[in-house]
Amino acid sequence: MSNCLQLNTSCVGCGSQSDLYGSSCRHMTLCLKCGRTMAQNKSKCHECGTVVTRLIREYNVRAAAPTDKNYFIGRFVTGLPNFKKGSENKWSLRKDIPQGRQFTDAQREKLKNKPWILEDETGQFQYQGHLEGSQSATYYLLVMQNKEFVAIPAGSWYNFNKVAQYKQLTLEEAEEKMKNRRKTADGYQRWMMKAANNGPALFGEVDNEKESGGTSGGGGRGRKKSSGGDEEEGNVSDRGDEDEEEEASRKSRLGLNRKSNDDDDEEGPRGGDLDMDDDDIEKGDDWEHEEIFTDDDEAVGNDPEEREDLLAPEIPAPPEIKQDEDDEENEEEEGGLSKSGKELKKLLGKANGLDESDEDDDDDSDDEEETNYGTVTNSKQKEAAKEEPVDNAPAKPAPSGPPRGTPPAKPSKGKRKLNDGDSKKPSSSVQKKVKTENDPKSSLKEERANTVSKSNTPTKAVKAEPASAPASSSSAATGPVTEDEIRAVLMEKKQVTTQDLVSRFKARLKTKEDKNAFANILRKISKIQKNAGSQNFVVLREKCQPKPGKRESRVNKLNIRSNLQPRKMELVTEDEIRKVLMEKKQLTTLELVMRFKERLTTTEDKDSFSHILKKIAKLQKNPGSEKFVVVLRDNVTPLASDLTRLSIS
């Protein structure tokens, strides 16, 4: 017991008698505050000179009394759950073994190593405890009682981990996933880098089917060739595209060179009698054994599924591209227009107002445009003679063709033209009128044609007569939106949304000034109101709407009503209220208010009316009907002014 720590009754520094500790050299008795100060200042012991670095305290440990209870230690890695009594969760602990079965002693011994399952009643939180330590390990629980510890033997130590609510992969499944990830993520990239660095000779060049004599059975597959790089360079240079260049280099490594001749398209997309059904031939010795990969996991070329993708036949060109090539050949043979000539023709057509027919006939082929070129040039000559010169119009060359007065030999399928003896002129003008209501550009063009036709000969004026109606409507549809037009639209349809109203005048709301004027008119004459379906729509502020009729009559009636309606109503006077009360003796409050309801709109009007009523009238109960009526307070003969007004009325 000589080595035991002997503490004095008080601290040597401050004299405190509570919370005492001994120094590491066991010579000094210090409280916690003085010991912390000496450790921070690196003070030394007064007797031995040892620097004070820590404080110690000794306890007696005794064995616990024998009991039948078994104790276990549980360690929670992710944090201790809420085990308080007041918590809402109720926890249960069980072994991960089948329930309700009888086990032998040997089976029970094996089941001791099974993990514990700790879960709450909701099943949301679940922990699994695994046995920690070896079978011969011994654990004790140190529980402090008074000033000594009690050592309680514990059976086992369990580490509890939270059970994941998602599916967990096994070790084999995880390895397979990582292998596929490496193969698809960077294996293909590394293989491509290796092929690019070493060139096509890495896998060996093969002969083209054409040079090998078109032998059957091999399906276009040849043998290794030392001079195959020149042909590959020729194919790449013919394409001139980066993507196709990569594709060509890849196919050259696999022995699948594409034929460069365009006159053998009938034989298939690749040319020749290539048989792609023979998988054994396609996956032959040249591909599998010429290149030896050092890394088996990242040998992308050894994957049979990926080899099938690489050996797949080339997708044929779309029919549109093939059609364009045929058209170019036909143009060269027949001496038609080139691409620059077509672009010039389109620009001339747009300048002469022919872009309408271009939009309607976008799906026509180039061959039809070539056959109708003479007719189109004739119509452009006539329309150019009718129109006045415009500053921003480009200079138009005069193409050769028949004279202006003679009709063309063939009618154009893709272009519209006005003829002198055309019997279908009114119907075409109606269709054009319907289009011009939604197309401001076409309306401006027709208006310009109409003004020019008035100064020409009578026969030309008859030609442009069907276009006069859309021209007049287009002239009215230009400029800022007026208040009358907005009123007419709101009266046509009771429930008009803001989006529908804006779409009506979208063509005329181009500038910022037009939009601001439109918004100001809307705030002035309309308001937002909700219907039964909680949808907002725009309505006029006036309650009564005119009867349906023509647009002009509606606007005129609306203007008359707005002019007749007084701008500001006068206040109700005392003489007027007296006059009403004397006309009818038994008048209720509601009836009196209804007489002047139209003039009681503002708070000022209502306050003045109430003040006059309190001054000259009072409520009196009618004995016959048990109702309160309004009567004058003086209940005398009316004033002379009142009698005079009554006689006049």
UniProtKB/Swiss-Prot annotation:
Keyword Magnesium carried by entry: no
Localization of this protein: Nucleus
Compositionally biased residues, Polar residues: 450-459
Low complexity bias (residue ranges): 466-477
Acidic residues composition bias: residue spans: 229-247, 274-283, 293-308, 323-335, 355-371
GO molecular function per UniProt: DNA binding
Main location: nucleus
Biased composition, class Basic and acidic residues, residue ranges: 380-389, 434-449
Task of the protein: TFIIF is a general transcription initiation factor that binds to RNA polymerase II and helps to recruit it to the initiation complex in collaboration with TFIIB. It promotes transcription elongation.
Family: Belongs to the TFIIF alpha subunit family.
Record's protein name: Transcription initiation factor IIF subunit alpha
Organism: Arabidopsis thaliana (Mouse-ear cress)
